[in-house]
Amino acid sequence: MKINIYYGGRGLMDDPTLYVINRVQMVLEELHVTVERFNLYELKNRITTLPQTIKTADGIILASTIEWFGIGGCMYQFLDACWLYGDKEKIAATYMSPIVMSTTYGEGEGKLALTSAWEILGGLPCSGICGYIADPSIFENNQEYIKIIEKMAENMYRTINQKMVCLPPSNQ
């Protein structure tokens, strides 16, 4: 099984989304999943070609950090590229799990935006995670938060491995 992670944040050291996707990646690799990460901020000049990387994945994670408003320009560019250049047949068979952390507010709306976009593209959504984390060091002292993140990764693995069926959305 292969899962691609598309990270739309800025790559700052104190980005809580980085902590979450690192933890998710660790859990998935323990489950013998091949994980490939694409940092969109490093690949700005290649964003239009990135939808082709979905072809080799069984599932993807769209991860973003809300610092002010919305899921960020790089993630929007990636989703636009999926709409314009993506293989719609492959997208229709690909599960997506959103990860959205906020340092201000709006994490729920961000998760909803990613899920809605993926459904409009014809993809299969699966449960994700969102939360408000002002200081990522909170993860070091809270085993319950770590357990939530690990369960999300395990649930994504289970969903993809069992090829769970999704009810059809109205926005396709």
Please tell me what each predicted stretch does.
Residues 1-87, 146-172:
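N-terminal beta1-alpha1-beta2 submodule of the flavodoxin-like/Rossmannoid cofactor-binding fold
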Residues 92-144:
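Short, glycine-/small-residue-rich phosphate/pyrophosphate-handling segment
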